[in-house]
């Protein structure tokens, strides 16, 4: 199984069990959620004084006024809150309620003991325990030798040498350079300049020095240096036992405690494992975790709470509401639609919102702050509410969302936007509870008394006593410039045209200066009188210290440098003109072009290539053969006849044109072209809407074929089959006959669907019975009369066709198992008249004179038209009747003469299978016909080029009437004609009147489906039965 799905499964699935914050490797993070809570806030109420002023001469300032008190009330609010959640620390995943280490590579033959650290089973090596190479070998086939010196091992996959302590990588051939030791020679010798053992760092002290670090001097003696006894343990290690081994203090390990603890371990001899998570570092001496920014806790397992970030979570986030602050560095993660360092800038221009900023905001522009750049929700100005910020706050409420309450006394009105009271004249204060201060009067105490420099002023008429610095009786004239004080006798000491106060002599500096004597210029960022004004510039390099005019940066303009350059301009003071084409905009700071969707290039001068669109000219999703793609938004414009999101769907039947919006106007089964709506008519119809039938002597598709009838007779408008006059036959009516026959179509007979259902049920029962009696019936036919009237079905020769059915010898009865041709058996000699005529049968009428006496009976041939077939029209015919009526006459030397019968052809009378007429295999070869005695044998093969048409034939009324007149008997012919039962009552579909005496019932040998598709054999001759009583039982 691939490793990636295993990792995802390990990280994503939570098995049974619950994490505990005290469990190892469990960390805490904070998640935000929405909650409804009860919030307290202060609401003002007024308390009237116990006594009020009623004496008009009293100073109103000395009277007690109503006092305002605040009481705590509660309201329900919806706000965002956060809560801690437990999860496995980085490098671990949850399994059965515990956090187990996770290895990025599967430990094939081992187990994961720490994050990305495998403990291999015996005999296996490598980071993932998948190699069984012997020591000193590596590679996928373990056929490469490790090129590592000093018997060093190598990685079984990469061949990288694992150099032991004291040898230099990469090949472990050289010892550590002087002054270095340990693994990879990463530590410096601690021997006061002396060399050390490259493996464990033991010092090689020079003469005169001793100690584990050569830090103990030896005394000089007569016999050399005398050195005190020392132990090799470094870094405070304590010797143990007689072997000189050392017990290392916390943070050190090795034989002489010269190696610091490796990462992840601490304590004495580095035996304790660190438990610091989320990138925290462990102090190798104490094991205390030094957490990375964004995490706290004794194991660095807790993420900074919401709103805090940085080292030890000491910093406060400064992100806009709705944005999230990253705990590590405090960067703001903006919600959709906002950008900027604090997520305060909208991505969409003012007044627009949506994914492409294409939707206009519906907020009242005067009373709304903005609309949300993604979903368009209006942010109302304080004092306004409603979906579109067009509803003012109710009385005594104000603020954002009208959530705050206000209280205004003495007839004051509350301003819905700020909650400030608009007090009645003479009152002031947050709740209009106080009189105007001395020397003021009027609405909001904005008017001063007429002697505004008086010691005292009436709030009504402004009467006053002059103060220092003023002169004349009404205290309206100040001291002259340069003087101040009582009687204006002191001189001012103000520089840079500063003016001193006539009362105190304090200097009022001109804009741009400050100080006791106006001798100092304004500090940077301040301007104006007394440098009291702060520069109000958004994107500037400071402002003018005198009048505060902002010095705008490139790309900005306006009094506060708060307006970006207008469209089409950029640079300092927006003095440069953009050169972007095709609707592109330029960056106001540097003039770079930002192209509109559908264009590209440095100046947006090039459109997207065909088949691409949008800002990045991405691939269109339209079907290139049936549509075009809008270069801006990729919208597919379908060509006529196509529809769908990508124009890959053709118009549904009955529709055409652009967007398939036009309805087809084709009749009689015609279809219309999906692009231009032109009608494609069925054979036999023409005209723009297929409403016109074919003109005389024309037939076929669009009536483009000429009838091939030799005598100028009419032909079928769909198939072109000729309707021959009496005495002629053949596909083109060229064949004459001694005995002429006319086969006339009759009108279809209608019946209700219930009759069709009953007929089908009866037919099914009869078919089962007939199959059981079939073998006996064949034997019963043998030895009967050999004289039959053969009626051969042949297709009429159409324009361009190459086949015709030859006449059939009268001496034989044949049937051909062919889907387009069928042969009727000849009538038998005159038997006794039956008592009952079975079913609807096929009869052939004859009005020709009798044959010579040597003949046993009449030899008649009839060629049926090509449109003889099984047809159905639900509103006219049932499901089991053929739609032609034919007549048959028979004469015998002993009989009374020919008879004529008409009747509808049904599948019971014909014995024909519907499948033989509507078979999907229209091709067959009819083999040789039996030759007559004394006549040369002729072979006839007919290859069928197509199945019979399924369209109902159409005949003009005059042609049908003429055919019916031709079938009327002559008074002198001796022919008896029995009228069709359908001529007077079309509802009697299945009934036939009794036959005249001496006329046998019609017989039709139906074809059976051949076992070889497309090729049919000639079955044995079948003779009609002679006993009439048995014929009636069929």
Curated annotation (Swiss-Prot):
Name of the molecule in the record: Platelet endothelial aggregation receptor 1
Topological domain ranges for the Extracellular compartment: 19-754
Biased composition (Polar residues): 972-991
Native organism: Mus musculus (Mouse)
Annotated localization: Cell membrane; Cell projection, Lamellipodium
EMI domain location: 23-101
Disulfide bonds: 27-89, 53-63, 88-99, 185-196, 189-203, 205-214, 233-246, 248-257, 270-282, 276-289, 291-300, 313-325, 319-332, 334-343, 402-414, 408-421, 423-432, 488-500, 494-507, 509-518, 578-586, 580-593, 595-604, 617-629, 622-636, 638-647, 660-672, 666-679, 681-690
PTM annotation (Phosphoserine): residues: 951, 1026
Main location: membrane
GO biological process: phosphatidylinositol 3-kinase/protein kinase B signal transduction; platelet aggregation; positive regulation of platelet activation; recognition of apoptotic cell
Glycoprotein found in the keyword field: yes
First and last residue of the signal peptide: 1-18
């Amino acid at each position: 199984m691939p490793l990636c799905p295993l990792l995802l499964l390990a990280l994503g699935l939570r098995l049974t069990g619950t994490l505990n914050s005290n469990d190892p490797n469990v960390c805490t993070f904070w998640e935000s959620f929405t909650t409804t809570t009860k919030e307290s806030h202060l609401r003002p109420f007024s308390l009237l004084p116990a006594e009020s002023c009623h004496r008009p001469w009293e100073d109103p300032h000395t009277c007690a006024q109503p006092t305002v008190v605040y009481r705590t009330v509660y309201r329900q609010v919806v706000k965002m809150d956060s809560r801690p959640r437990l999860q496995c620390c980085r490098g671990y995943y949850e399994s059965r309620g515990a956090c187990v280490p996770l290895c990025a590579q599967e430990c094939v033959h081992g187990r994961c003991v720490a994050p990305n650290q495998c403990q291999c089973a015996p005999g296996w090596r490598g980071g993932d325990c998948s190699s069984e190479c012997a020591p000193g070998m590596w590679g996928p086939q373990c056929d490469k030798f490790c090129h590592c010196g000093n018997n060093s091992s190598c990685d079984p996959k990469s061949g990288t040498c694992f150099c032991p302590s004291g040898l230099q990588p990469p090949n472990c051939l050289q010892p550590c350079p002087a002054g270095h030791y340990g693994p990879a020679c990463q530590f410096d010798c601690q021997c006061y300049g002396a060399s050390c053992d490259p493996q464990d760092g033991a010092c090689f002290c020079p003469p005169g020095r001793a100690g584990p670090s050569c830090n103990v001097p030896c005394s000089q003696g007569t016999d050399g240096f005398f050195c005190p006894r020392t132990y090799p343990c470094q870094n405070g290690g304590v010797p143990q036992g007689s072997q000189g081994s050392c017990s290392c203090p916390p943070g050190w390990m090795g034989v002489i405690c010269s190696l610091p603890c490796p990462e992840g371990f601490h304590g004495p001899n580095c035996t304790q494992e660190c438990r610091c998570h989320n990138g925290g570092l462990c102090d190798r001496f104490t094991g205390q975790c030094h957490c990375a920014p964004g995490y706290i806790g004794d194991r660095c397992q807790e993420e900074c709470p919401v709103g805090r970030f940085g080292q030890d979570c000491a910093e406060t986030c400064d992100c806009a509401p709705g944005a999230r602050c990253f705990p590590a560095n405090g960067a703001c993660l903006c919600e959709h639609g906002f950008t900027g360092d604090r997520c305060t800038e909208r991505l969409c221009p003012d007044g627009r919102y949506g994914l492409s900023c294409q939707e206009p905001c519906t907020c009242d522009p005067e009373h709304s702050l903005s609309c949300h750049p993604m979903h368009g929700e209006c942010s109302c100005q304080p004092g306004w509410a409603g979906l579109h910020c067009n509803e003012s706050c109710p009385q005594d409420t104000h603020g954002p969302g009208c959530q705050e309450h206000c209280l205004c006394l003495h007839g004051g009105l509350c301003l819905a936007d700020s909650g400030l009271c608009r007090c009645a004249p003479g009152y002031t204060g947050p709740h209009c509870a106080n009189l105007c201060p001395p020397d003021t009067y009027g609405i909001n105490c904005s008017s001063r008394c007429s002697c505004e420099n008086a010691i005292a002023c009436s709030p009504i008429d402004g009467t006053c006593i002059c103060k220092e610095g003023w002169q004349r009786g009404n205290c309206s004239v100040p001291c002259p410039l340069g003087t101040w004080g009582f009687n204006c006798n002191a001189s001012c000491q103000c520089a840079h045209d500063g003016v001193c106060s006539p009362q105190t002599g304090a200097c009022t500096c001109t804009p741009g200066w400050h100080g006791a004597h106006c001798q100092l210029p304004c500090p940077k960022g301040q301007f104006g009188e007394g440098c009291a004004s702060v520069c109000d510039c958004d994107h500037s390099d400071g402002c003018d210290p005198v009048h505060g005019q902002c010095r705008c940066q490139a790309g900005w303009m306006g009094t506060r440098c708060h307006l970006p350059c207008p469209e089409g301009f950029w640079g300092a003071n927006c003095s440069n003109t953009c050169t972007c084409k095709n609707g592109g905009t330029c960056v106001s700071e540097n003039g770079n072009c930002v192209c509109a969707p559908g264009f590209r290039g440095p100046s947006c001068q090039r459109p997207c290539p065909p088949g691409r669109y949008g800002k990045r000219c991405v691939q269109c999703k339209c079907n290139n053969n049936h549509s075009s793609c809008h270069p801006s938004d990729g919208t597919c414009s379908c060509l006529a006849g196509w529809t769908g999101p990508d124009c890959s769907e053709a118009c549904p039947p009955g529709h055409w044109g652009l967007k398939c919006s036009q309805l087809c106007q084709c009749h009689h089964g015609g279809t219309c072209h999906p692009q231009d709506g032109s009608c494609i008519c069925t054979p036999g119809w023409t005209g723009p809407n297929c409403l016109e039938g074919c003109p005389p002597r024309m037939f076929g598709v669009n009536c483009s074929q000429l009838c091939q009838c030799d005598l100028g007779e009419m032909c079928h408008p769909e198939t072109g089959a000729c309707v021959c006059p009496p005495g002629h036959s053949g596909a083109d009516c060229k064949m004459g006959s001694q005995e002429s026959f006319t086969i006339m179509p009759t009108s279809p007979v209608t019946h209700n669907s219930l009759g069709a259902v009953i007929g089908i049920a009866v037919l099914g029962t009869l078919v089962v019975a007939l199959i059981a009696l079939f073998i006996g019936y064949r034997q019963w036919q043998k030895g009967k009369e050999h004289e039959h009237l053969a009626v051969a079905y042949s297709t009429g020769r159409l324009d361009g066709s190459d086949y015709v059915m030859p006449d059939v010898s009268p001496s034989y009865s044949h049937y051909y198992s062919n889907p387009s041709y069928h042969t009727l058996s000849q009538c038998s000699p005159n038997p006794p008249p039956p008592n009952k005529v079975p079913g609807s049968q096929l009869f052939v009428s004859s009005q020709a004179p009798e044959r010579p006496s040597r003949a046993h009976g009449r030899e008649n041939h009839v060629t049926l038209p090509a449109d003889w077939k099984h047809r159905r029209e639900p509103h006219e015919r049932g499901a089991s009747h053929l739609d032609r009526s034919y007549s048959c006459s028979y004469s015998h030397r002993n009989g009374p003469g020919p008879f004529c019968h008409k009747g509808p052809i049904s599948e019971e009378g014909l014995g024909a299978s519907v499948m033989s007429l509507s078979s999907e295999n229209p091709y067959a070869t009819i083999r040789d016909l039996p030759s007559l005695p004394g006549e040369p044998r002729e072979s006839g093969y007919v290859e069928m080029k197509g199945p019979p048409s399924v369209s109902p034939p159409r005949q003009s009324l005059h042609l049908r009437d003429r055919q019916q007149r031709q079938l009327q008997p002559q008074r002198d012919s001796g022919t008896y004609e029995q009228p069709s039962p359908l001529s007077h009552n079309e509802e009697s579909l299945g009934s036939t009147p009794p036959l005249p005496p001496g006329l046998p019932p019609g017989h039709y040998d139906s074809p059976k489906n051949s076992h070889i598709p497309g090729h049919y054999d000639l079955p044995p001759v079948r003779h009609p039965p002679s006993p009439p009583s048995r014929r009636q039982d069929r």
